[in-house]
Amino acid sequence: MITREFDTIAAISTPLGEGAIGIVRLSGTDSFAIAQKIFKGKDLNKVASHTLNYGHIIDPLTGKVMDEVMVGAMKSPKTFTREDIIEINTHGGIAVTNEILQLAIREGARLAEPGEFTKRAFLNGRVDLTQAEAVMDIIRAKTDKAMNIAVKQLDGSLSDLINNTRQEILNTLAQVEVNIDYPEYDDVEEATTAVVREKTMEFEQLLTKLLRTARRGKILREGISTAIIGRPNVGKSSLLNNLLREDKAIVTDIAGTTRDVIEEYVNINGVPLKLIDTAGIRETDDIVEQIGVERSKKALKEADLVLLVLNASEPLTAQDRQLLEISQDTNRIILLNKTDLPETIETSKLPEDVIRISVLKNQNIDKIEERINNLFFENAGLVEQDATYLSNARHISLIEKAVESLQAVNQGLELGMPVDLLQVDLTRTWEILGEITGDATPDELITQLFSQFCLGK
């Protein structure tokens, strides 16, 4: 009996809906045999690998022509999954792609689970776990810089760094083991405390340096979470729309019309800015609006950046002062909106430099982008073209654990503990790093990771 892991799977690999092309993908030992049953054209078993072949998809039971197609035939092992792959290129459309998928399933294929094609690439050694995760990052990338990080990870930059470090740790462990078991060998360098500590300090410094890229990598991957706050009707939603250059939030003259948290992305110098337009924070008896206010407070706590919008044409209110207070420990930019009207706000009572804007007149909006650029990019040296970045929360957590384990080794060596007693912590470091690439990852976690992928990938 063919196991579920190695039967033939099929799925639609293009987004459902109308389009020029739709693709139904098959992977597995029986891909060619199944496709041949429903394809009228060249014998797919005899065509050269990695070729496109013209023909028609036919229902073998009725003889009905389903569509005019081009079939890509790719023979293992030089494929994404390292299995035989068939890609049926149809005319785009929900009905035709679904019909062809159902034909493939009827003739012996199984509907693929989310991410199962990439999972097979991992199980068959085509990619490691970091590269598989990079595939999803490429799909989800919102800017060119985020995509570049994912492409470097797919190319193996992070894998190489982790694998090389694991190998060096393994060499150190082997050296310690030989010294313990065969002390009479003179041709092996003695694993003294000084020798081992020099190496483990190098490992710790390398991984700590990698951890320093985590904040920048997370920003490039996920964006700068930016909360737009202010009392009701100061122009928060209008500012959001202006930055997005389209109407996504409800903009009216009635206070309290944003009753929930609205999230949108805008591209700032190749980095995604996740704009969160919060409900105005104020006391209210409206239950729905109260929920929005609570979510706004939560968004404020979690934001990387806060844009506090004040009304320049009115004196500071108690609500304004409350917002100034609760946002004072955040990375904040204060915006004075409605500067096209006479200014009455007391700027002397504001704690920092402000940016005067008029969303209505589209004045000084570019200065907001300049300030964000200075805060996060130029001053922080955000992007280095050839650097390897940590951007995945799973990777960051595991590297932190590996550093902690190495710190335990180094502290033990400092206290004069015998090297052999510290083997456990050093071995644990080696195992933790293996979880990043998938060499030592529980099956349940692997299943969970790939379940986040879309069907057909």
UniProtKB/Swiss-Prot annotation:
So which cofactors does this thing need?
K(+)
Q: Which residues form the TrmE-type G domain?
A: 223-377
GO BP term, example: tRNA methylation
Q: Name one GO molecular function term.
A: GTPase activity
Q: Where does (6S)-5-formyl-5,6,7,8-tetrahydrofolate bind?
A: R25, E87, R126, K457
Which residues of this UniProt protein bind Mg(2+)?
S237, T258
Signal peptide span per the entry?
Answer: none
| CDD domains per UniProt | trmE, TrmE_N
Where does the chain bind K(+)? N233, T252, I254, T257
Sections of the chain in a coiled coil: none
EC number(s) reported in the record = 3.6.-.-
Q: What keywords would UniProt list here?
A: Cytoplasm, GTP-binding, Hydrolase, Magnesium, Metal-binding, Nucleotide-binding, Potassium, tRNA processing
* Note describing how the cofactor binds: Binds 1 potassium ion per subunit.
**What enzyme category does the UniProt record give?**
hydrolase
| Subunit and partners | Homodimer. Heterotetramer of two MnmE and two MnmG subunits.
- Give the HAMAP family listed for this entry: GTPase_MnmE (MF_00379)
Entry function: Exhibits a very high intrinsic GTPase hydrolysis rate. Involved in the addition of a carboxymethylaminomethyl (cmnm) group at the wobble position (U34) of certain tRNAs, forming tRNA-cmnm(5)s(2)U34.
- UniProt protein name: tRNA modification GTPase MnmE
Organism (species):
Streptococcus pneumoniae (strain ATCC BAA-255 / R6)
Q: Which gene encodes it?
A: mnmE
